A protein has these predicted regions:
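Amphipathic alpha-helical dimer-interface segment in Rossmann-like NAD(P)H-dependent oxidoreductases
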Residues: 109-127
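The beta1-alpha1 cofactor-binding region of Rossmann-like NAD(H)/NADP(H)-dependent oxidoreductases
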Residues: 36-37, 57-69, 100
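Canonical Rossmann dinucleotide-binding motif of NAD(H)/NADP(H)-dependent dehydrogenases/reductases
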Residues: 1-29
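C-terminal helical subdomain
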Residues: 163, 170-216
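Catalytic loop of short-chain dehydrogenase/reductase
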Residues: 13, 132-157, 163, 170, ...
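Active-site loop of short-chain dehydrogenase/reductase
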Residues: 2-3, 79-80, 94, 125-137, ...
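Catalytic Tyr-X3-Lys loop
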Residues: 89, 96-115, 158
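Conserved glycine-rich Rossmann-like NAD(P)H-binding loop of the short-chain dehydrogenase/reductase
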Residues: 27-41
């Protein structure tokens, strides 16, 4: 059975780039997306380049659908070898305009969903003493953007989560890495999703860095 790489579909192209990279290297890809339309579009693109891929819809802001999705994945496709969490809620606004509820709602996607997703695959990885967890971060985790206060907070939080997991899971043979993307992802630029995907593959292969700042 081929290894399984799971990820959450995104609109920025990072998910698609990673899926193509891992899929072209023998991974069977399972996508999780909030909407069926986005999911089917992503699957169609992958299958056109002959990548074995499947998909399930789940809302990253709600733990119950996430847990149900991972149960379904294990039942249908087997144990997860690589998890990539790429979901984010990107909403403009400075800290003065940010409400408590907005921050809570955004953190459900930007951070809590990452923890919930990881918790679904960690027990099997610990038992097998192998596995990889990836989290897509942002340069704003290091240098907050005042115009995107909530996202800056969320990316800082998920960075801390990833670093904490790396320390905790490393002794169990599990690699945890993250890529901090410092600008807008756009095809044909330095921040092309396929260039970013190459970094994920490099980290997966070498397993020698806890984080990589992708910055021009």
């Amino acid at each position: 059975m081929k290894p399984i790489s799971e990820r959450r579909c995104g609109k920025d192209g990072v998910s698609a780039g990673i899926a193509r990279k891992f899929g072209s290297n023998g991974f069977r890809v399972v996508l999780l997306s909030r909407t069926e339309t986005s999911l089917q579009r992503s699957l169609e693109d992958l299958r056109q380049v002959h990548i074995e891929s499947y998909g399930i819809t789940a809302d990253a802001s709600d733990p119950d659908p996430i847990k149900a999705a991972f149960t379904q994945i294990e039942n249908l496709y087997g144990i997860t070898d690589v998890l990539v969490y790429n979901a984010a809620h990107i909403a403009p606004g400075d800290a003065l305009s940010l409400t408590e509820q907005q921050l809570i709602d955004d953190l459900k996607v930007n951070t809590v969903g990452a923890l919930t997703s990881a918790q679904q695959v960690i027990p099997d990885m610990v038992e097998r003493k192998q596995g990889t967890l990836f989290f897509t971060g942002g340069g704003i985790a290091l240098n907050p953007n005042p115009l995107y206060a909530s996202l800056s907070i969320g990316k800082a939080a998920v960075r801390s989560l990833a670093l904490s997991l790396a320390e905790t899971l490393g002794p169990h043979g599990i690699y945890v890495g993250q890529v901090l993307i410092a600008d807008h992802v756009q095809r044909g630029t330095f921040y092309d999703p396929d260039r970013i995907a190459d970094v994920y593959w490099e980290l997966y292969t070498n397993r020698d860095r806890k984080e990589y700042l992708f910055k021009e």
